[in-house]
Regions:
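Active-site loop/oxyanion-hole signature of alpha/beta-hydrolase fold enzymes
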Residues: 52-59, 94-135
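Conserved alpha/beta-hydrolase catalytic His-Asp/Glu region
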Residues: 30-31, 194-260
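Catalytic histidine-centered segment of alpha/beta-hydrolase-like enzymes
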Residues: 300-309
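Conserved loop-alpha-helix segment in the C-terminal half of the alpha/beta-hydrolase fold
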Residues: 267-300
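Flexible "cap/lid" loop of the alpha/beta hydrolase fold
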Residues: 149, 158-191
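Alpha/beta-hydrolase fold catalytic core
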Residues: 1-65, 88-90, 129-130, 321-325
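Gly/Ala-rich beta-loop-alpha elbow adjacent to hydrolase catalytic centers
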Residues: 136, 140, 144
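Conserved HGGG/HGGXW glycine-rich cap/lid loop of the alpha/beta-hydrolase fold
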Residues: 53-102
Length: 325
């Protein structure tokens, strides 16, 4: 017979876990009610993909813009200030990366960053897009670079907004393998503890994300920030982080491909006050490693698509116009 103390402890743990799960479920549904889908879905071999598709190319030579958000982001990071402006001259497609926003992987598909790179080609084939310019913010920048390296005939240019270009810290292969083997742990955390904790700390976390810029008052709804409270989105972010070391090291090892003749043009914008990714270790380092033109900096933080849309639009237009020639 188990001791009374052990029985009480186990019962308390079960009650706490169920309470956290119910709380997470309620918060997830509330977030989805506040921030409903803003676009449409397409069925691809690997994913049921939610995207915003607006605008029309001003000429037959103009490429289509595909916008790729960062870690735990969603299409609203671009629809907040960028898409309407860009859609006046280009066809603009902003995607929810599977697991984020309202996109999801199909059953049996491995949830890898390389699969997200392959997704760019799937989108282009499905929508019959011949040449695209990729716009990547933060982790989305790394995915855009991976796609440019893998599909140079498809990608006509890359516009990077505060991109992740290499690992911020060194991760040992042993630690990376251990993290990859603990998916069950991330599932448990995302479905119980993570959402309630993030809800309590969300103001502080958002301030850190935007610093030193102010967080827009309507970021939670119009910027899609409340969707980050969903358990599925948190799990996708955990999986992205776990997969990042091995995948990004491989992408970095192929950066020389971006210096070869006929490679896609790469341009970059970085905030000198970025508190999430280092402008020097990520931006200046990459600009020196690869032929980045132009490489622009400004006095701003990390969330450039929401806080500095005019500068973002200018950079994207320059890349897209160059790809049209």
């Amino acid at each position: 017979m188990p001791s009374p103390f052990l029985s009480i402890t186990l019962a308390a743990l079960v009650i706490a876990t169920v309470t956290l799960w119910v709380t997470t479920t309620v918060l997830t549904r509330r977030a989805e009610a506040r921030v409903p889908p803003a676009g449409r879905w397409i069925d691809l071999p690997s994913a049921h993909l939610h995207l915003i598709d607006r605008g029309q190319a001003a000429s037959a030579q103009a490429p289509v813009l595909i916008l790729i958000h960062g870690l735990a982001g969603q299409t609203q990071h671009f629809s907040y200030r960028l898409i309407d402006e860009l859609a006046q001259s280009y066809r603009v497609i902003a995607i929810d990366r599977p697991g984020s926003g309202y996109s999801r992987w199909r059953a049996g598909v491995r949830h890898t960053l390389e699969a997200q790179v392959a997704l760019i080609d799937e989108i282009a084939r499905h929508l019959d897009l011949q040449r695209v310019v990729l716009v990547g913010h933060s982790l989305g920048g790394a995915i855009a670079l991976g796609a440019a390296i893998r599909y140079p005939d498809r990608v006509a240019g890359v516009a990077l907004l505060a991109p992740l270009t290499r690992l911020p810290i060194e991760v040992s292969p042993r630690l990376a393998r251990w993290l990859a083997s603990t998916d069950w742990l991330w599932r448990f955390v995302s479905q119980t503890i993570a959402t309630p904790m993030l809800r309590v700390r969300r103001q502080r976390l958002r301030a850190d994300l935007f610093a030193p810029d102010a967080v827009p008052a309507d970021y939670g709804v119009q910027g899609g920030g409340d969707l980050t409270l969903r358990s599925g989105q948190l799990l996708a972010a955990c999986r992205d982080l776990v997969a990042l070391p091995a995948w990004l090291d491989h992408v970095v090892s192929r950066y020389d491909d971006l210096r070869s003749p006929g490679c896609p043009a790469v341009a970059m914008l970085y905030g000198l006050q970025d508190a999430v990714l280092s402008p020097s270790l990520q931006g200046a380092w990459f600009a020196e490693r690869v032929q980045v033109s132009p490489y622009r900096t400004l006095d701003a933080g990390h969330m450039l698509p929401l806080t500095r849309p005019e500068a973002c639009v200018q950079l994207i237009r320059q890349v897209a116009d160059g790809a049209s020639r």
